[in-house]
Amino acid sequence: MSSYFVNSLFTKFKGGDSLRSNYYDCPSYTPDLGGRPSVLYGHNTGSAFQHAAQFPDFYHHGTSSFPHASYQQTPCAVAYPGDATGNILGQDGLQKQSFFGAPDSDFTQFGDCNLKVSGIRDDLESAEPCTAQLFPWMRPQATGRRRGRQTYSRYQTLELEKEFLFNPYLTRKRRIEVSHALALTERQVKIWFQNRRMKWKKEHNKDKFPSSKAEQEEIERERQEGSQVSEKHTSGEEDSEASSNSK
């Protein structure tokens, strides 16, 4: 029974015609085993491809010798022989060589990139500058412009007077501490002490401000003695006037 099954298969599928290379839709150039012309089994089977003898004329004269009807009706691509593929690859190689061998100035496929870059540059140049907020202390001061007078509050004046009575000359470290404590600048504290020393010299009729605390205490003592003498003098005059009036 098995031999019957095998024989039926062999009689149904023959080895010569059924195993041809052009059985599928896309035929290759490999000549068929039977030596017969290729037969297409696609949807366009009206006309068959030409014999292999016409290939030399086709590749010798160019693409114009290719049959127009076969080109339109053949559904699949045609496989070319070895020499034909060599010619085609050679032409592609020449085209690639001429393409890559051209100078950079001849390339126009990247022109749009240059246009985009130039457009971005124009946009950046035409953009308005950023207007940042400027505070009064950030603006440059003119040379001929006169500064306004600084007004001190009662608390600031009281603290500065206390510091002046303790020490009329401030060190740099102490001046920084006072300026931070009173919310003033070092320059403002320095100017206030200079003006205060000038005022003291006018009040005491001195050409020079005492450089030490001892000198300042001595001056204060003399001032107190002078005030006491003047008071005694005025009181004596009043007593003499009162005695003369009683007489």
Curated annotation (Swiss-Prot):
InterPro entries: Antp_homeobox_TF, HD, HD_metazoa, Homeobox_Antennapedia_CS, Homeobox_CS, Homeodomain-like_sf. Its main location: nucleus. The keyword Ribonucleoprotein does not apply. The keyword Cell cycle does not apply. One of its GO terms (biological process) is regulation of transcription by RNA polymerase II. GO terms for molecular function: DNA-binding transcription factor activity, RNA polymerase II-specific; RNA polymerase II transcription regulatory region sequence-specific DNA binding. It is found in: Nucleus. Residues 201-247 are annotated as: Disordered. Residues 145-204 bind DNA. A motif (Antp-type hexapeptide) lies at residues 134-139. PROSITE patterns: ANTENNAPEDIA (PS00032), HOMEOBOX_1 (PS00027), HOMEOBOX_2 (PS50071). Sequence-specific transcription factor which is part of a developmental regulatory system that provides cells with specific positional identities on the anterior-posterior axis. This is Homeobox protein Hox-B8b. It comes from Danio rerio (Zebrafish). The lineage of its organism: Eukaryota, Metazoa, Chordata, Craniata, Vertebrata. The gene is hoxb8b.
